[in-house]
């Protein structure tokens, strides 16, 4: 089974659970925390994906790291993923859940990667411009800092990519010159 299908299945199941428990907002917030945590900690991602580490150890680390920050329902979901050997896909599952949750509320997710952290004002202006471009009622920014971009940022909304980074511009110039 492909990673996308696995992520879809678990994300849909969690969405159904959150809707039936009337805890969609809380679960969405929890998955946002999980997603941001994984985006900022490549060590945790590697740890969870390592098949040599026992399930018990993975559970203990997840409880220690996220136990105080997320609801018991979300934590139990993470434990289920560990038990079923699917915790390596947690990042994709959380992203898919957020997409489904936001789509249900007519919110577009924009994955923004910038060379430096964006200020609150920059985030607000970017969200406003993306709202105009997409026609969405609301834009949710998923922020990530990637110094390799040199300058500027990239925005990914659905299958569209807007690349204003210096690295992207240098790549275009390189392709034009045939280097």
Curated annotation (Swiss-Prot):
One of its GO terms (cellular component) is proton-transporting ATP synthase complex. The keyword Chloroplast applies. It comes from the Eukaryota. GO terms for molecular function: proton-transporting ATP synthase activity, rotational mechanism. Keywords: ATP synthesis, CF(1), Chloroplast, Hydrogen ion transport, Ion transport, Membrane, Plastid, Thylakoid, Transport. F-type ATPases have 2 components, F(1) - the catalytic core - and F(0) - the membrane proton channel. F(1) has five subunits: alpha(3), beta(3), gamma(1), delta(1), epsilon(1). CF(0) has four main subunits: a(1), b(1), b'(1) and c(10-14). The alpha and beta chains form an alternating ring which encloses part of the gamma chain. F(1) is attached to F(0) by a central stalk formed by the gamma and epsilon chains, while a peripheral stalk is formed by the delta, b and b' chains. Belongs to the ATPase delta chain family. This is ATP synthase subunit delta, chloroplastic.
């Amino acid at each position: 089974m492909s990673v996308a299908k696995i992520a879809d299945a678990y994300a849909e199941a969690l969405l159904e659970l959150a809707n039936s428990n009337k805890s969609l907002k809380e679960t969405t917030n929890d998955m946002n925390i999980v997603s941001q945590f994984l985006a900022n900690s490549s060590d945790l991602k590697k740890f969870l994906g390592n098949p040599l580490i026992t399930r018990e150890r993975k559970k203990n680390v997840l409880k220690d790291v996220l136990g105080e920050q997320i609801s018991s329902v979300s934590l139990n979901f993470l434990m289920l993923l560990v038990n079923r050997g699917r915790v390596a896909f947690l990042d994709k599952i959380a992203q898919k859940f957020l997409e489904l949750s936001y789509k249900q509320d007519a919110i577009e997710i924009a994955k923004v990667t910038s060379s430096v952290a964006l200020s609150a004002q920059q985030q607000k202006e970017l969200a406003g411009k993306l709202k105009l471009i997409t026609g969405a009622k609301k834009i949710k920014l998923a922020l990530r800092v990637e110094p390799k971009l040199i300058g500027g940022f990239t925005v990914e909304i659905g299958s569209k990519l807007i690349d204003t980074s210096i690295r992207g511009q240098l790549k275009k110039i390189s392709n034009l010159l045939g280097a």
